[in-house]
Amino acid sequence: MVDCKSVSTPMELNFRKLSGNSVGPVLENLTEYQQLMGALMFLVNSHPDVCFAVNTLSQHMVDPHHIHRIGARNLLRYLRGTINHALRYTVGSLRLHGYIDADWASNVVDRKSTSECCFTLGSALICWMSRRQKSVALSTAEAEYIAPSMVCCEVVWL
């Protein structure tokens, strides 16, 4: 993968929908896929931009199919293209900022929404979260209303 062609996004569009309909045999070398996912989970600490892709791929560590290997390979190609990118923390005011979003009915299996948030202290990203909501929201507004209550628990922890 050293000389591979890089891609501009860590995950292909509609990958979650495609991977949810996996058919066919499980990958022969299960350990190799699991070790790759472990390494990518460690990498999330310094590359928060791949967090969603790693989360999606790691949900299939027990029974990965060929499409999951393609997704992992795509993620490695993205990382190859961003090898010189870095997070930059500058000195500034130490104000805490939080950003919240909700993805309505994003899970195609149970139609539960996902709440996401991130917090910065000054210009430094100090915490981020992406969690599936426990109840099924009937509208976008309801999903957006549930998200802040989940995030308040995270703020108390900070």
Briefly describe each language-model feature range.
Residues M1-L158:
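Long, low-complexity, charge-biased intrinsically disordered regions
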